[in-house]
A protein has these predicted regions:
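Short solvent-exposed loop/turn micro-motifs enriched in small/polar/acidic residues
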Residues: 1-2, 67
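Eukaryote-biased recognition of intrinsically disordered, low-complexity regulatory segments
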Residues: 3-14
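Short glycine-/small-residue-rich flexible loop motifs, especially phosphate/cofactor-binding loops
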Residues: 6, 26-30, 122
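Residues at alpha-helix termini
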Residues: 11, 31-32, 127
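N-terminal cofactor/phosphate-binding cores enriched in small/glycine residues
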Residues: 16-70, 76-80
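Extended hydrophobic/Leu-rich segments
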Residues: 25, 157-158
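Fe-S ferredoxin-like electron-transfer domains
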Residues: 54, 59-157
């Protein structure tokens, strides 16, 4: 019997074993460091990950102290010897910018929303320290009809 070689990737400098359920960097990080380590907006078990919102971006180097690349962790496969960085000033600024852009197309008066205090966007914005956005002229959404063409999406969209 030959023992299989353990496959390891590094999260913020610490080694972790890559398991069979670690199909993406996001799943890998969540399994060891919890749900909140990398923020997400479009991560949902009922949807295939495709990196649309980019809030889950992390930096990855293919070797220790090598050059890094920013990737969407939800759809980037975890690989042996990857060095994954979950938070730094650049990533925080990127995430804040993305969420601020999303907020420009979102009603800012959360008190009137039916999901106030139970809203993923509100939670991520608060976690990133966003209380207001710097982009002017947000859409007002007054009179905008809800898209009711699919029941699952209807349960996610609260305008």
């Amino acid at each position: 019997m030959s023992a299989e070689k353990r496959k390891v990737a590094y999260i913020d400098g610490k080694p972790y074993e890559i398991g069979p359920n670690h199909t993406s960097i996001l799943k890998f990080v969540k399994s060891y460091l919890g749900e909140k380590k990398v923020p997400t907006l479009c991560d949902d078990p009922n949807l295939a990950p495709y990196g649309a919102c980019r809030v889950c971006s992390v930096e990855v180097a293919l070797e220790k102290d090598g050059p890094t690349k920013v990737v969407a962790s939800c759809h980037t496969p975890v690989g042996e010897n990857q060095h994954i960085f979950t938070s730094n000033d650049g990533l925080q600024n990127l995430r804040k910018n993305i969420v601020e852009l999303v907020l420009t197309d979102h009603p800012m008066n959360c008190d009137t929303c039916e999901v106030d205090k139970n809203c993923e966007l509100q939670t991520v914005a608060n976690d990133l320290g966003i209380s207001d956005h710097r982009y002017n002229n947000p859409k007002q959404h007054k009179g905008t009809p809800k898209d009711t063409s699919h029941s699952y999406m209807l349960s996610l969209i609260h305008i």
